[in-house]
Amino acid sequence: MGRKWANIVAKKTAKDGANSKVYAKFGVEIYVAAKKGDPDPESNTALKFVIDRAKQAQVPKHVIDKAIDKAKGNTDETFTEGRYEGFGPNGSMLIVDTLTSNVNRTAANVRAAFGKNGGNMGASGSVAYLFDNKGVIVFAGDDADSVFEQLLEADVDVDDVEAEEGSITVYTAPTDLHKAIVALRESGIQEFQVTELEMIPQSEVELTGEDLETFEKLYSVLEDDEDVQKIYTNVDGF
């Protein structure tokens, strides 16, 4: 599993580096986190968490700073979180998280993306029950047992710790992700490849041929929507 996360991170980072839409999405997320609390990340853990993720995606510093400065201003722009669930070809499923200033626009766009690209949007809860909400942390290392013990000593609710090909992957209860990051930093680990709240599928499907092509198009259209923040799926490799 550690290799899977590393591969996904490498794939996304390569795309993110040339994708200004990703920067814009993080800009919105940073703005919202800063607006909800203190614009200083040292006293706003939610903001610091988003900034750390943005840095992992190679978002430039000026994008981060601009979003924080915007939150410090007098703008009244508001954003609403949303979640949509749906189905793609041959047993594939998707959960789409959004952050938008226009809920009606976003709902229509997501529904159209499913309908025009071989998918079907489902009702709330139609997919999510087949996924588990977990915190995921990935960093360089090979001693899973030691990391597990450190996190238990820090009273972190740990689901699992895996070591594979020089990477450690930690799975935590979603409420303990930040606590786990703090504990790992205090133990001397400063560089993380992944620090995310994830919806992890209880089982995966592997798509090939036309099914894979159809799914890739559906995924791409959703990902390109400016209001879509994250997509979770049960398709292997995504």
From Swiss-Prot:
Database matches in Pfam families: TACO1_YebC_N, Transcrip_reg
Keyword check for DNA-binding: yes
Keywords annotated in UniProt: Cytoplasm, DNA-binding, Transcription, Transcription regulation
Family annotation (InterPro entries): Integrase-like_N, TACO1_YebC-like_2nd/3rd_dom, TACO1_YebC_N, Transcrip_reg_TACO1-like, Transcrip_reg_TACO1-like_dom3, Transcrip_reg_TACO1_YeeN, YebC-like
GO BP of this protein: regulation of DNA-templated transcription
GO molecular function term, any single one: DNA binding
Highest taxon of source: Bacteria
Chief location bin: cytoplasm
Compartment(s) where it occurs, according to its Swiss-Prot or TrEMBL record: Cytoplasm
Alphabetized NCBIfam families for the sequence: PRK00110.1 (NF001030), PRK12378.1 (NF009044), YebC/PmpR family DNA-binding transcriptional regulator (TIGR01033)
UniProt name for this protein: Probable transcriptional regulatory protein SSA_0586
